[in-house]
Every structure is written in C-alpha cells, then in structure tokens.
C-alpha cells in the first residue's frame, strides 16, 4: 500500500492480515502481550537481532485477528512519514494519512521495528499515544484523533546492540510495558 511516500524515502511499510507464522513460545510472552493489548497499553520488545521479536508480533497479530502495519525504522524515518502529508492531486491539495494515522483510526496494530533508529520527532509524535490519552495530534491539520479501541502500539529496539547505537531515553522506555527477548 502506498502512503504517498516519495521514492527517496527508504521505508518498508506493510499492511496485512498476517498469515499465521511459526513462533515457538518460550515463556509467558503470549500472556503478557494479550494482557497489554486488553489494557490498551503500548509494548516495547527489547533484544538482539534474530531473537524473534518481529516474528512474535506477526504471530500475535494473527492470534488476535488484527491487521498489522510494520514500519522498519531507520535514520531518515520522520514523523511526517508516519503521520501523513499533503499531496498534489490534479488541481487540488489533499491530505494523505500515513501508516500511524491509518492504524490509529482503524484499530490496527502498529509495529515500529528499531524505533530508536528513527528521527527524534517520531518519538515526539507517538508520545501521547503511549499514555492514558491514547491520542494522535496532527499539527498540519490542527486535529487530534483518539485512538480506536483496538489500536495497539508495539515498538522494538536492540539495547546496546552496537557501538554508537541510539538508545531510547528512560523517559520514553517507561511509557511502555517492556518484554525482553534473548
């Protein structure tokens, strides 16, 4: 699905009804995820590359029967890429929702893979979605959207993965229920 992103933006955006992937449950991660989902909280998956974080999110989206939007974050991922932008269509300018706005409005699971790699404005954009407000403010429209009851924010990162790696601030991490993968 094209969210109106320019060709020079390297973003892997997928909206899908996930086919049931294989995932080997190793602890209470399924129960924790289900409780977090039921309580409308965000979850942060921490762990090194290859520990099954992305596979787990796909597995849980399938188990819950929810659509999943996956964003592979990188150093150029901006809040505009996630929220949306104005585009020219014919003789008019129209607003095109980004994947975050789409997930918030429609009750999808949004997975921000490697969120610490994204630009700082991404963290600012999701800030009010990670607390009791569960709201998305779109500055360019001057509008605030209350998250759909089924919306869930999932983020992952690899703490201490490599030298020079961007870390999430403690003030950001404390807004999420954390689940470690080893």
List PLM regions with ranges.
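AAA+ P-loop NTPase catalytic core and its hallmark functional loops
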Residues: 1-182
